[in-house]
Amino acid sequence: MLDKIEVPIEAIAAREILDSRGRPTIEAEVLLESGALGLAQVPSGASTGSFEAHELRDDDPQRYGGKGVLKAVRNVHEKIVPVLEGMNAFDQASIDLAMIDRDGTANKRELGANAILAVSLATAKAAAADLGLPLYRYLGGPMANVLPVPMMNVINGGSHADNNVDFQEFMIFPIGADSFKEGLRWGAEVFAALGKALHERKLLTGVGDEGGYAPNLASNQEALDILIESIERAGYKPGSQVALAMDVAASEFYRDGQYIYDGSAHSPAEMVDFLASLVERYPIISIEDGLHEEDWDNWKLLTDKLGARIQLVGDDLMVTNPIRLQKAIDLGIANSILIKLNQIGSLTETLQTIALATRHGYRSVISHRSGETEDTTIADLAVATNAGQIKTGSLSRSERVAKYNRLLRIEEELGDRAVYAPKVGLGPKFLA
């Protein structure tokens, strides 16, 4: 049906705005000849995989410490606009391919993945607006009705916080709830209980980049112990109602073939054994980036040891890239992929990567970045693809909560058609 609709792009504009860390990012607007308008903002990561698409910055020390994005804005106006003006907004694949071809590099270094993605998403939003459809319905069609289970990052460490916790994210997973709305409430109640538990221990209750608490703790295990206590204090059962997940972000503390955590160096085999011991001790059902992004051999060891029991998610390992995902599939590594739009740099490529994962039985976890905006595209993307899981931070900071609130509205809009992912087997991939 959509291939028979033609509405040309009339104008495209871009500007430099600020993200949640006070750093510049790019916003794009796409106006169609029908008058429909789409607006999109691009996030930015703190711990980034080496193989991500290129985020173009100005490198001008006189502005924003070199982090400005005026080059990307200029590329939209001078290089992307001449290519896309007049193209059919409903031909998303051709629009994205035209920008990729104009860029001409393997990682979008010429135009910048941030410039390309901003226009890509704004085009999709304009097309949805032209039809009077919400973005999730435009992208996903009539079967887009699964609300994701949220992976709530309530204790921040690593590159997301100025503390001594090695692992980057400790998350709660309300898998036992009956609806997204109920799961969100459970998460908020556990988050409140966690704040009280930290306060009673005279630990800091300031928050990190993603809205989770960022206390100094004696060990990574202490973070898990406090989470178990907080789940119980909120009135829920650890595991069956609220499970745990971790983003280890192991590439961030990998040095010369060793993993440096809890104050000492450990071999890859010791790292695998340590993660396995945590799974034995705690109700952990998902581990992301448990090893370095290029430690393929030991990723295989980790997968053989835990892959039939819990969800093993590749983020830095796969960077939303179909080539790296295919390598993981071929090697039997991990069983899930984290999906970040700006890692690959266009909507079309993101959807292709999700489709590849689905064909091979890998789950997709739709994710934010540590530097976010009020843009809620990922909430719609999670529902559009029936991904079943979303990572968008804690229960504080409005750029995080905006995505949760968008999902609440989608669930309400869907009414009786709305399905909470764990109820139909579309939550985390685990067999324990």
Curated annotation (Swiss-Prot):
Mg(2+) binds at residues 247, 288, 315. HAMAP family: Enolase. InterPro entries: Enolase, Enolase-like_C_sf, Enolase-like_N, Enolase_C, Enolase_CS, Enolase_N. Belongs to the enolase family. It is found in: Cytoplasm; Secreted; Cell surface. PROSITE patterns: ENOLASE. The keyword Cytoplasm applies. GO terms for cellular component: cell surface; extracellular region; phosphopyruvate hydratase complex. The active site is at residues 210, 340. Its EC number is 4.2.1.11. It catalyses: (2R)-2-phosphoglycerate = phosphoenolpyruvate + H2O. Keywords: Cytoplasm, Glycolysis, Lyase, Magnesium, Metal-binding, Secreted. Binds a second Mg(2+) ion via substrate during catalysis. Its cofactor is Mg(2+). It is an enzyme of class 4 (lyase). GO terms for molecular function: magnesium ion binding; phosphopyruvate hydratase activity. This is Enolase.
